[in-house]
Amino acid sequence: MVADTHQRGTAKTARNPIKIDLEQSGQLLRKPSWIRVRSPNSQRYQEVKRLLRENKLHTVCEEASCPNIGECFGRGTATFMILGDLCTRRCPFCDVAHGRPHAPDPDEPMHLAKSIAVLKLNYVVITSVDRDDLRDGGAQHFADCIRAIRAQSPQTRIEILVPDFRGRLEIALEKLSACPPDVMNHNLETVPRLYKQCRPGADYVHSLQLLKDFKAASPHIPTKSGLMLGLGETDEEIIGVMQDLRAHQVNMLTIGQYLQPSIGHHPVMRYVSPEDFKTFERIATNLGFSHAACGPMVRSSYHADQQAHEAGIE
């Protein structure tokens, strides 16, 4: 595969160990009334898009076809995606393209910090594609971005949503601990039974260890994780994952509804009602999470500033 080849949908997942059942995927469940998304058409939305293009920046909002993009861009917030727009993994729920990435752009931290300063953002989320091709998984680039943002916008709070750094965990955590964020986020995404199907190349135990080891190295930094419902999990399995997260000292939690980006992606197996999401939120509170955001349209970085504020991060 040549660099910059963008594979999506069935082209991306063709080599996965567990194939998508296209016949089942074609039998789409009807979206319930509580799944509603605003069209992205505000002036602020266009302003944010223009600034991103001028500075050659990517957002996970666009690359992953997030349903909340109109609202978030309209509020002048975005989750910036560093290290390019090509992922080395092939997760069938995700709309980010797979391919052989280019080398990291050494000017990206500067461009990112400049854009954040121009937008006068008080809270930013920085995420990335998986970069299994890099010796540190991209951790140094995360640290460089954090450092550049703090230099230009010292008042801005920074949350990072990191990949799993599988096979590179020790060196990655060393680099991140030297320049830590205000919130450390790594999403488990789903239950361990579905990992081979939904997160090929990832490992449930390893992801928990990442969160635990970061907390051990930086105990004052809140840790956070997120889950999607509708991939084939049971309620009991979700509660088990919540218990595992608390056992690994994770402070904050998000749970949202999985929405299928295209017919070539993993099908939606169920739609969870707002009432059931509220039940998960109550369980999370009882388990001791400092903050839990659970709802159909909740995403890991959706209203992340409000989540952090409610968890006591100023």
Swiss-Prot record:
Reaction equations catalysed: [[Fe-S] cluster scaffold protein carrying a second [4Fe-4S](2+) cluster] + N(6)-octanoyl-L-lysyl-[protein] + 2 oxidized [2Fe-2S]-[ferredoxin] + 2 S-adenosyl-L-methionine + 4 H(+) = [[Fe-S] cluster scaffold protein] + N(6)-[(R)-dihydrolipoyl]-L-lysyl-[protein] + 4 Fe(3+) + 2 hydrogen sulfide + 2 5'-deoxyadenosine + 2 L-methionine + 2 reduced [2Fe-2S]-[ferredoxin]
Keyword Translocase: no
Necessary cofactors: [4Fe-4S] cluster
Metabolic or biological pathway: Protein modification; protein lipoylation via endogenous pathway; protein N(6)-(lipoyl)lysine from octanoyl-[acyl-carrier-protein]: step 2/2
Free-text remark on how the cofactor is bound: Binds 2 [4Fe-4S] clusters per subunit. One cluster is coordinated with 3 cysteines and an exchangeable S-adenosyl-L-methionine.
Keyword NAD found: no
The EC number(s) this enzyme carries: 2.8.1.8
Ligand binding ([4Fe-4S] cluster 1): 61, 66, 72, 301
Superkingdom of the source species: Bacteria
Membership in a protein family: Belongs to the radical SAM superfamily. Lipoyl synthase family.
Protein name (database record): Lipoyl synthase
Organism of this sequence: Nitrosomonas eutropha (strain DSM 101675 / C91 / Nm57)
